[in-house]
Structures are given as C-alpha cells and as structure tokens.
C-alpha cells in the first residue's frame, strides 16, 4: 500500500518492484498528471483518490492503510520513489511467522550513480494489518498500538532502494515539522 501524487514517471519502476504482492492499494492525494489513469491499467492495483486537508503525511498513510482489507496478514508500505530488490516477497514469507508483528530490513536512502549505497539504515514499513497506525505530520512513524508485546524481526535479505525525485519541492515540510514538535 502507499500514497502518491503526480508520480507518473515512477509508476513503471515502482510497479515492477511491488507486483510480487497479492494486491496493491494506492491512495492518490490529488494528482494532476496521468498517475491515476496509469495506475488503473495495472493488474492487482486498486487506486482511490482522496483530498487530505489539511495536508499531513500520517493522515494520508493511515487512509491508504485503511484501504487494505482487515483479513490481510502482512502489509508492505512502499513509496513510489522506492524500489525493492527482486525476491523480497519470498524472503518475507521465509522469515515471517504468525507471531511476527513487524519486519525491519535494509533501506538505501542514498545511492551513487552505480547504485552503491551512500547512506543506509534499517527501515520497518512491513507490518501485520492490525495494531498499527502512522503518527507525525511529516517524517511519519509507524506506531504499534497493540496490547501484546510487539515482535519485530530483522530480514537482512530484503533491501529497499530510494530514488528521490529531486525536482519535487519539500517546502511544505518545515511547517509540518513545526506542527510535529507542537504535538510532541
């Protein structure tokens, strides 16, 4: 599942990365390009359009998570500028158990021109369907809400690469960061 807005140039690469999933749920938050039309043509993709006002990333992510049926066991949140290395699904199935609540895996936030990682760390956007919500208006965090102990596993054989769109403005981030501080 994921959120998008004006991502038509990333759709093919993104889809080739996520198509191992059983179903793909996307919340479009107001694209003015061909994103929605292109997504509707893809197998297994269900796209919903919704305006988020006032804009917050956590609200958008929670609305996209709510598109995933309650009976799904595992949710994988992926942005359109992120690409899983092939075989992620098999690795996930090989490591996930019925007691797992979340998985942590490799995230290459910055890569050089030869796809060698410059900045890498663990990320944990794979989780069970229930007992999770996104918090914070920007640089949102997946928060466990269950009453039982969270059981996070680490899967070093899953890697997600980040290829950010350098042309997109991040000017709205500062007010969202300020709001996040006020809410803390």
Regions inferred by a protein language model and the residue ranges of each:
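Acidic helix N-cap motif at the loop->helix transition within catalytic regions
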Residues: 9-12, 33-41, 87
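A conserved acidic beta->alpha catalytic loop
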Residues: 17, 27-38, 52-54, 79-80
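Conserved donor nucleotide-binding strand/loop of the catalytic core
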Residues: 37-67
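Receiver (REC) domain switch/active-site residues of two-component response regulators
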Residues: 22-23, 45, 73
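Catalytic-site signature of metal-activated, phosphate-bearing donor transferases
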Residues: 57-66, 72, 78, 83-184
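A short acidic, amphipathic alpha-helical/loop segment
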Residues: 13-17, 38, 63, 90-91
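Structural beta-sheet core signal
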Residues: 2, 26, 102-104
